[in-house]
């Protein structure tokens, strides 16, 4: 765990769950637990048709396993396409694919430590059936949960971006959709506070206004090292504590 504000990091104790040969992918998410003024890390390990989860708590410096219980119960978890979780509205979110049902958003409430389903918009499945989906990801656009999909056109020289915004959190009927044409997108890194998309295209890393389609090329020459761009907030977390080190220590 690293706090860039004070340039200190903490080596975490080893997790309980191991990534065995049959494990398919690993997902992490970090969240602030407001009720206890604490931080938690969610770790999901997916296997062939199932998944396990564990939570690290900063105050106790320990991991413990949590059970994934969903209503209706999901028996077959096939794949989680992203390696990180999005923190929004007190919960961590990730897209989940199931072997026996349509994909959905898996949310983990940091306060009560319960998993819940948030269904993807119905119109997305129509897009998925008729389109070549290149990227699908979660983001926060102007305070609302958003589901963003980038599709390639047949010529693979251009594409389209579909954006669904959940106007009322957790309410399936509140998904609203907007589709805009755009040049081929190579990668997506999230959204800025004002709702612009951070994407990589043929010109490099750009910030794109999906309403006006105005693009601003960012002063980052090579985005290959980038994987995820969360919002930053200054904090004194890790100022004191066990196993905390400075960036400048040998």
Please describe what each predicted stretch is:
Residues 1-250:
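Short, conserved recognition motifs on repeat-domain binding surfaces
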């Amino acid at each position: 765990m690293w706090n860039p504000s004070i340039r200190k990091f903490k080596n975490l104790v080893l997790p309980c769950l191991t990534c065995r040969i049959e494990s398919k992918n690993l997902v992490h998410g970090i969240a602030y637990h407001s009720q206890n003024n604490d931080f938690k890390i969610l770790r999901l390990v997916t296997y062939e048709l199932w998944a396990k989860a564990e939570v690290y708590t900063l105050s106790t410096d320990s991991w413990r396993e949590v059970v994934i219980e969903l209503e209706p119960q999901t028996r077959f978890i096939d794949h989680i396409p992203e390696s990180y979780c999005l923190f929004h509205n007190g919960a961590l979110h990730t897209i989940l694919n199931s072997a026996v049902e349509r994909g959905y958003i898996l949310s983990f409430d940091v306060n009560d430590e319960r998993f819940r389903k948030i269904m993807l918009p119905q119109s997305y499945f129509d897009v998925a059936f008729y389109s070549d989906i290149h990227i699908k990801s979660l983001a926060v656009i102007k305070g609302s949960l958003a589901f963003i999909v980038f599709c390639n056109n047949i010529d693979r020289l251009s594409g389209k971006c579909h954006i669904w915004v959940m106007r009322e959190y957790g309410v399936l009927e509140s998904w609203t959709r907007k589709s805009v044409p755009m040049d081929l997108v190579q990668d997506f890194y999230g959204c800025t506070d004002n709702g612009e998309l951070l994407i990589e295209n043929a010109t490099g890393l750009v910030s794109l206004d999906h309403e006006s389609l105005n693009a601003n090329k960012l002063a980052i020459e090579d985005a290959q090292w980038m994987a995820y761009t969360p919002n930053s907030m200054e904090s004194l977390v890790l100022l004191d504590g066990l196993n905390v080190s400075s960036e400048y220590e040998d």
